[in-house]
Each structure stands twice: as structure tokens, then as C-alpha cells.
Amino acid sequence: MAAPAREPALRCCIRLARVFLLLVLACEVAGSDEAEAREGAASLAGSCGCGTPQRAGAHGSSAAAQRYSREANAPGLTSGPRPLALTKMVPIPAGVFTMGTDDPQIRQDGEAPARRVTVDGFYMDAYEVSNADFEKFVNSTGYLTEAEKFGDSFVFEGMLSEQVKTHIHQAVAAAPWWLPVKGANWRHPEGPDSSILHRSNHPVLHVSWNDAVAYCTWAGKRLPTEAEWEYSCRGGLQNRLFPWGNKLQPKGQHYANIWQGKFPVSNTGEDGFQGTAPVDAFPPNGYGLYNIVGNVWEWTSDWWTVHHSVEETFNPKGPTSGKDRVKKGGSYMCHKSYCYRYRCAARSQNTPDSSASNLGFRCAADHLPTAD
């Protein structure tokens, strides 16, 4: 009975979220020409649960990072099935790294300047939170996501059935491939006629920042800071575009789930996926993290700002307040001509109540959570 009284407020929130997304996507389109123009320069920026058995590189040593990079660039690399580990967290060692870049590809995102950052050791989920993980949380708590409360979420048009599209009469003006779909949520990623059947090991979608925090709290974890996330993404390598080096496809091999073809009209799926990939797809980076770029955007704990000090910082946590939260890593929808944000230094933002069909998360922790 309380729902009708809540409905006007929800409609207002939905309108605000849609306006914000429109602005963000407009910025993405505006920045695409610059990103494309800088492609050559980017290529020349540098050379190219608990107690589980540890994967090679899980401790994040420099040797592991260099081995990962060498393997990525070595001939004849093949990718076979990799079983999920018994625990979902790997240790990330304390260290110092260069955060951001002095060669920003999308200036308005605040990628610059490069600055020296020190982080303490912590733990990071090896995988993005999966549908199976999130379902355990929902079954345990009865939690309703914000997309479920609002009654809709944004879905990429290319993933929708014709039946669903016939009921949609609006789109984001600056990016008409984004459609607000009634009934779209984590259980129904492409709308009411879709399901997560056979996708239990894919990343959970349509989770807002608030939803992600709720899950992390339940799991005895937290969201990573932007600095922790970027440090983890780099996997022990310094000043590289991607977790494995500077070449997107070393020796023709795919290391991330991003868009292939002409966005948004044709995705060839050359990497094996046209939508999300399983959370254990593709080789892990030097710290043992899978899909740290591509697949789905990942929330961080930081409030958004584009102003950064060049002074050295220790365990930075971002601004103390704001209206948007930082997300990192890009998604399966990212293409260099449109959204060149699958680089470690790249970043974007969204309101804490926003959700979409390419947005997920992974957790961090200061210590390994104890089992109940």
C-alpha cells in the first residue's frame, strides 16, 4: 500500500537519472572524435570465501606482472577453460604507482594529471559479482534493487527483442541506442521477456551504486576506492594503457570483452561474446583479476571529481561529497570510436541510483571476510 505514495518521488528520480545519463552519453559522443584522433599517439605512448589454492600471479609480484605481459605478447597463446577458484578474493600488495595519465585520451573525464599514489595492501574480488552471487544475497535478505523499485532500467537497443521494442516510445536523444525498458532489472537484463537462466556465471547487471554497497556490506566487504581499483587494474605494470600492456590485441589474441565492429550497428563478436562474458573469461592480469577492463563497468566508492592534485597521496578516497560516483573499466559496449574507456586510467561517472545493462561491480576488503 505504500507504493502509490512513493510513486511520484520515484518518477522524479527516474527523470533525473535519465537526464544525467543523457548528459554523460552526450559527453561520450563529444569525446569520441578526440579519442579517435589520438589513436596513433596512444599506441606510441609506451611499449607495447578463503584459504584457496593460489593462481599464478595472485600475489601480484612484479615478476608475475611481467610474466603476464610477456605471455600476452608471446606467439601461440591459447585460452582454455579456467575453473573458478574456491575463494573470490586475491591479495593485492601494498605499493606505489602512477595514477592517471599525462596523455589523457578523454580530457573532460579528468584522466590527468599523472600523480604518485601509495596504497596499503588489501583484497580484491578476483571476479565481478555474478548473478549467482547476487542471487544468494537477495535470497538471504529479500533485497530489492533500485531498478526493481523504479520499475525500469536502461538497456542497449541491440540486446532487446522486437516485442519489447514495440512498447518503447522514447530514447536518450544523444544516444538513441539506450532505451528505458520497463521490467528490466538484474533478473531480466534485457527486459521482461529475458532471464538469467544459463547466465549464473555472468556479471550481475542493473545494479546501482547503492545496490552494490548493500551487497558488499552483506558480504563483509566494501567497494574499492578509485585508487585501489586502478592500482589493481594495472596488475603490477607501470604506465601501460591496459592491464597486459599497450597493445589491445597482442599477437591477435583477445584479452577483454569489448565491442568489435562498427558501433552501434554491428558487433562481430570476434572475442566470442556480443553481450556479457562469464566472470572468469579471458586470462587474469598480474594480480589474478579477471575482466578488470571490459565486460561491465565497475562501481568504485569515490565521489566524482575532475580536479586532482599532483602531490603524492596515500590511500586517497576522493572527495567527501558529490552527486556522482566514479565507475571504471568500460564494458562490452565500449569501442574506441565511441567510448575509449577500457584503459586503466580511464574513468566515468553516474548517479548513485542509476543502473544499466552494462554496469556491475566487484568488492574489496581490508581483510578476508570470515565465514558465517
Curated annotation (Swiss-Prot):
Secretion signal, residue range per the UniProt entry: 1-31
Region (Interaction with sulfatases): 339-358
Segments for region (Disordered): 61-80
InterPro entries: CTDL_fold, Sulfatase_Mod_Factor_Kinase, SUMF_dom, SUMF_sf
Annotated Cu(2+) binding sites: C334, C339
GO BP, sorted A to Z: post-translational protein modification; protein oxidation
Pathway: Protein modification; sulfatase oxidation
Subunit field text: Monomer, homodimer and heterodimer with SUMF2.
Protein name as catalogued: Formylglycine-generating enzyme
Organism from which the protein derives: Mus musculus (Mouse)
Lineage: Eukaryota, Metazoa, Chordata, Craniata, Vertebrata
